[in-house]
From Swiss-Prot:
E.C. numbers: 4.2.1.33
Assembly, per entry: Heterodimer of LeuC and LeuD.
Molecular functions (GO terms): 3-isopropylmalate dehydratase activity; 4 iron, 4 sulfur cluster binding; metal ion binding
Cofactor: binding comment: Binds 1 [4Fe-4S] cluster per subunit.
Organism, scientific name: Prochlorococcus marinus (strain MIT 9312)
Catalyzed reactions: (2R,3S)-3-isopropylmalate = (2S)-2-isopropylmalate
Swiss-Prot/TrEMBL cofactor(s): [4Fe-4S] cluster
GO terms classed as biological process: L-leucine biosynthetic process
CDD domains: IPMI
Alphabetically ordered keywords of this record: 4Fe-4S, Amino-acid biosynthesis, Branched-chain amino acid biosynthesis, Iron, Iron-sulfur, Leucine biosynthesis, Lyase, Metal-binding
Pathway field: Amino-acid biosynthesis; L-leucine biosynthesis; L-leucine from 3-methyl-2-oxobutanoate: step 2/4
Xref: InterPro entries: 3-IsopropMal_deHydase_lsu, Acnase/IPM_dHydase_lsu_aba_1/3, Acoase/IPM_deHydtase_lsu_aba, Aconitase_4Fe-4S_BS, Aconitase_4Fe-4S_dom, IPM_dehydratase_rel_enz, IPMI_cat
Name by which UniProt lists this protein: 3-isopropylmalate dehydratase large subunit
Amino acid sequence: MSQNTLFDKVWDLHKVSSLPGGSDQIFIGLHLIHEVTSPQAFGALKDKNLKVKFPSRTVATVDHIVPTDNQSRPFKDNLAEQMIETLENNCLQHKIKFFNIGSGNQGIVHVVAPELGLTQPGMTIACGDSHTSTHGAFGSIAFGIGTSQVRDVLATQTIAMNKLKVRQIWCENNLSNGVYAKDLVLHIINELGVKAGVGFAYEFAGPAIDELSMEERMTICNMSIEGGARCGYINPDEKTFSYIKNRLYAPKHTQWDKALLWWKSLKSDENSIYDDVIKLDASKVEPTVTWGITPGQSLGINQLIPLLDDLPPNDQFIAEEAFEYMGFMPGQSIKDTPVDVCFIGSCTNGRISDLRVAAKILKDKKVSKKVKAFVVPGSEKVATEAKEEGLDKIFKDSGFQWREPGCSMCLAMNSDKLIGNQVSASSSNRNFKGRQGSPSGRTLLMSPAMVAAAAINGKVSDVREFINK
C-alpha cells in the first residue's frame, strides 16, 4: 500500500532524471515571470542565442515596481518604465502570454495566476519570487527561484533541486471569531521559528485548514518561506475544485472531467510517512501581531513582548537587535502601539476576501487623523470586483486611499514607502529592517482586519472589539 505524501507524488511525476551529486532534474509545468527577476534571464538567453523552450508554459505580468498612484505611461519612474518595457519586448519576441496594465488581468503574480485558473493541483510551479509557495494552496508544488534558475526554466523548462523532506503541520480545532489565516500562519512561524523549515516542504492539514477558504489557504502557503520552508502545500479538496471551475484557463467540458478525476487522486495517502509532524491547537490562536524584525517575532494581541531570559539562547541576539531597532522593551504590551501608516494589500492579503473583511470593519467609521492609510488591490480583477461591491467607496469614505494593483509597500520598490521612523500596520509578509522603504521604518505584520482596526484607532487594536460590538 502506498505511503506517499502529495509532495512525493508530484515530485516523482515531474522528475526528469537524477543528477550527479544527489539532486534531481525537475520539469516545471508553469513558469510565472514578472518585470524584476526576468530581464537578466532573457539577456542570458540572448547571449547564447537560445529561445524559450515552451512559451505556452510561461505567463507574465507586472507587479513589483509598477506605480499604484498613477499608471499612465510613460511612468514618472524611468526605471519602472524601462523594466516594464523590457518585459513587454521579451514577451513579444518569445510569444509569451503577458497580462499588462489595462488588460483586466494584471496584478501581483501570485494573485493573478490562481484567479485565472492557471494554478492547478499536481503542478510544479516556479517563479522568480520568494512567495511562489502561495500556489501550494491548490495542491501544487511551487518554488521561488533565483534569476539564474529563471534562465534555466526559460531555456529548458527544468530546474535542478535536492528533494525536500516533508513536515506535516496539523492544525487541530478551528479558529475563533475575529482570528484569521494570517494570525494562524504568524502563530505557526512563531512556534516553529524562521529557520525550522530549511530543507522541508510544509504540508498544512487538519480541521482548521479544511475550514479555510481557498484565499485563506493561499495566505497560509504564501508565508511558508517565512518559516524557512522551500514550499508549502495543502491537499486539494472540493473547495479547491469549486474555486478553479469555470475560470478562464481551467479545463473545460470533457477535459474538466478528466482533470477532476486526476486531481482527486492527488492527496497524501492516509498512512503517509512524514519526516516530522507538528500539532497545533488553532482554537488557542489570538489576533497576532509581529513586534520584531522577523515574521517569527510575533505574539497574540493580549500577550506581552517576551523577556530575553524567556527566549531560547539562539533567539536572544536577534531579539536584542529587534528591541533596539523597533524601540520596544521586553515585557511591553504590543496593544495600543501608535501607528503612522496602515497598508492593506500584497500577495499575502490583497485578495477580494481580504478587502471584504477589512471593509466590514471600516464601514461607517473614519481613519484616525494621525494615520495615512491605503489599500492596494492584488489585481485588476480584484479591483473590479471590489468596485462592483462598493468596497472602494467604503474604503475611500473611511479615509483610505484607493490605489491601483501592484506589490506596493510590501517591498517599496515604487514610491509607496515609509518615511523616517514611521510605524506601519501592514497586511504584508515581511518585517525586515528597511523592508518598507525607509532604513529606519518599522513594520508590524497583522491581518487586514487588524490593519483596519489600527487605522480607525490610530494604534494597534484588538479587532474583536469591533466585531463583537
